A protein has these predicted regions:
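Short, Lys/Arg-enriched N-terminal segments with co-localized hydrophobic residues
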Residues: 1-21
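Pre-Walker A (Motif I) flank of P-loop NTPase domains
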Residues: 23-27
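Glycine-rich phosphate-binding P-loop
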Residues: 29-42
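A conserved segment at the C-terminal end of the G1
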Residues: 42-48
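Short beta-strand-centered segment that lines the nucleotide-binding/catalytic pocket of NTP-utilizing
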Residues: 52-62
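ATP-dependent small-molecule kinase phosphotransfer cores
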Residues: 62-117
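Small-molecule kinase domains that catalyze NTP-dependent phosphoryl transfer to phosphate-bearing small molecules
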Residues: 80-87, 158-203
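Conserved phosphate-donor/acceptor-positioning beta-strand/loop module used by diverse small-molecule
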Residues: 133-152, 159, 166
Length: 219
C-alpha cells in the first residue's frame, strides 16, 4: 500500500492478519539487484495491509532538502552522480552533501517506523532501525542467472544492460553500506532472514514473509 508520506494518517493500530491483533512493527528489506525484492515488498505490504516505503523516501528527502527528486535518486547510492560532477567538478563538497542526504533519509525512516507498522526498502533501514524491538530484517537474493532473467523478462532490459546494472547497482549498494553502516560486516548482520526469491517467486515470498510476521508480531 503506497500513498504520499504527507497524506498518510498518524499512528494507527496494526491491522490483524489472521484474526488476531498485531503489535506495531517494521520490516526492513535489503536486496540484490534483480532479485525482485522491491516487488516482494509491495506484495507483502498488500498482504499485511501496511504501508510500503521506497520511492516515497526519495521524494520526501527532496522536499525537505529543496532539491530535485532526480538529484536525490541519482546520488543517494551513486558516487558517480552526474549532478555532482557538474556542480563539483573537482569533487569538492560531494561527501558532505551525500552525507546530508543520508542523515535526512535516516530521520525520515525513523519517523515512518515510529508512526505505524510499515515496510522499508533499502537505504540501510536494517541498521538505522536495529534498536527497534519489533523489527524483522530480510535480505532478498537470487542466483545470478535468475536475476539476469528477471531483468530481461520482467524489467524489460536487454541482456547487456541487465548485466551492467546488476554489476553496478550491487557495487553501489555495497559501497553505500560500507560508508554509512560500517558496523555491518556482511549481509548476515542486521538480517533475521535470508530469502532466495528464485525458490518462491514474488507472491510466494510475500506469503512466506507475511506468515513469519504474523508469528512474530501477534499480540
Amino acid at each position: 500500500m503506497c500513498r504520499s508520506i504527507n497524506s498518510r494518517p498518524g499512528p494507527q493500530p496494526p491491522e490483524p492478519l489472521g484474526g488476531n491483533a498485531m503489535k506495531q512493527y517494521v520490516i526492513t528489506i535489503s536486496r540484490q539487484f534483480g532479485s525482485m525484492g522491491r516487488s516482494i515488498a509491495q506484495a507483502l505490504a498488500q498482504q499485511l495491509n501496511i504501508d510500503f516505503y521506497d520511492r516515497d523516501i526519495v521524494e520526501e528527502t527532496a522536499r525537505r532538502m529543496g532539491l530535485p527528486v532526480s538529484v536525490i535518486s541519482d546520488t543517494e547510492e551513486n558516487a558517480k552522480s552526474v549532478y555532482f560532477r557538474r556542480i563539483y567538478p573537482l569533487g569538492m563538497g560531494v561527501p558532505n552533501l551525500r552525507d546530508e542526504i543520508f542523515l535526512v533519509q535516516k530521520n525520515i525512516i525513523r519517523d515512518l517506523a515510529a508512526k505505524s507498522s510499515c515496510i522499508v526498502v533499502g537505504r540501510c533501514g536494517g541498521s538505522i532501525l536495529a534498536d527497534m524491538p519489533n523489527r524483522l530484517g530480510v535480505y532478498v537474493y537470487a542466483p545470478y542467472s535468475q536475476r539476469l532473467q528477471n531483468c530481461t523478462q520482467k524489467l524489460g532490459m536487454d541482456e547487456a544492460t541487465a548485466r551492467r546494472m546488476i554489476r553496478e547497482v550491487d557495487r553501489a549498494r555495497e559501497l553505500y553500506h560500507r560508508r554509512y553502516c560500517p558496523e555491518v560486516k556482511d549481509v548476515f548482520t542486521d538480517h533475521d532472514l535470508m530469502l532466495d526469491s528464485s525458490r518462491f517467486g514474488v507472491e510466494g515470498s510475500a506469503r512466506l514473509l507475511a506468515h513469519i510476521a504474523q508469528t512474530l508480531f501477534e499480540t
